């Protein structure tokens, strides 16, 4: 678990070209797993990559 890499909401928003509020909404909706560190979310890279794969599958289905 110590080897896990974590991303911020802002980093993900920038990569996906969406607003940080959109990323937070995905987290609240349970679509993107995240740790809540007293109001600041951290997303494991592994969970983010899984989220991206699910989005890709959803776009092609």
Residue ranges, per PLM feature:
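Polyanion-binding surface elements
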Residues: 1-25, 54
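Major-groove DNA-recognition helix of helix-turn-helix-type DNA-binding domains
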Residues: 16-41
